[in-house]
Amino acid sequence: MTTAIEYPSAMAKARFVRISATKARRVIDLVRGKSVEEALDILRWAPQSASEPVAKVIASAAANAQNNEGLDPTSLVVATIHADEGPTAKRIRPRAQGRAYRIRKRTSHITVIVESRPPKKAGKQGASASAARARRAQASKAATKKATDSKEGSE
C-alpha cells in the first residue's frame, strides 16, 4: 500500500483554444513530468503550432504558483497536463456542382497543474552505483592479472 505525497500545486486552464486536441496532445507529451523551465525551453523551439498556446498555459500556471501560492519558481514541475476537446465550430465550404463540404474548426481545453517538488538528491544512489562498478572492474583486473601470472609461472 503506497501513500501519495501531496506537493503544493497551482493550476491554469486555457479554454476554447483554436487548435485541435490531438495536435495539442502531441506537444503536451513532450513536456509532461519536466521542470517548468525545461518545458518552456522545449516548447520555445518546438516547430508545432500548438507549442505556443501550451507554453502560455504552463507560464500562467507557474505565475499562479509564484504569485498566489508563494512557491519557488525554480522547483516547479509540470505534474499534470492534458488537452480535452472543446466545442467544434462548423462551417460550410462551397464546392463544384452545388455540393458543399463541412469544415470543422476544432477547439480544445488545455489544463496544467504544476507542483513544487524538492530537488532530487543525486549524490547517494549515483555514487554507490559508480563505486560498485569501479570495485567490480578492479576485481576483474586483479583476477585477469593473477591468471596471466600463473600461466607465465607454469611455463
UniProtKB/Swiss-Prot annotation:
Superkingdom to which the source organism belongs: Bacteria
Recorded GO CC terms: cytosolic large ribosomal subunit
CDD domains: Ribosomal_L22
Pfam families: Ribosomal_L22
Entries under SUPFAM superfamilies matching the protein: Ribosomal protein L22
Database matches in InterPro entries: Ribosomal_uL22, Ribosomal_uL22_bac/chlpt-type, Ribosomal_uL22_bac/org-type, Ribosomal_uL22_CS, Ribosomal_uL22_sf
GO BP, sorted A to Z: translation
GO molecular function, a single term: rRNA binding
Cited PROSITE patterns: RIBOSOMAL_L22
Bias type Basic and acidic residues, positions: 146-155
Sequence segments annotated as region (Disordered): 109-155
Keywords: Ribonucleoprotein, Ribosomal protein, RNA-binding, rRNA-binding
PANTHER family: CHLOROPLAST 50S RIBOSOMAL PROTEIN L22-RELATED, LARGE RIBOSOMAL SUBUNIT PROTEIN UL22M
Main function: This protein binds specifically to 23S rRNA; its binding is stimulated by other ribosomal proteins, e.g. L4, L17, and L20. It is important during the early stages of 50S assembly. It makes multiple contacts with different domains of the 23S rRNA in the assembled 50S subunit and ribosome. The globular domain of the protein is located near the polypeptide exit tunnel on the outside of the subunit, while an extended beta-hairpin is found that lines the wall of the exit tunnel in the center of the 70S ribosome.
Subunit architecture: Part of the 50S ribosomal subunit.
Similarity-based family: Belongs to the universal ribosomal protein uL22 family.
Protein name, per record: Large ribosomal subunit protein uL22
Origin species: Mycolicibacterium vanbaalenii (strain DSM 7251 / JCM 13017 / BCRC 16820 / KCTC 9966 / NRRL B-24157 / PYR-1) (Mycobacterium vanbaalenii)
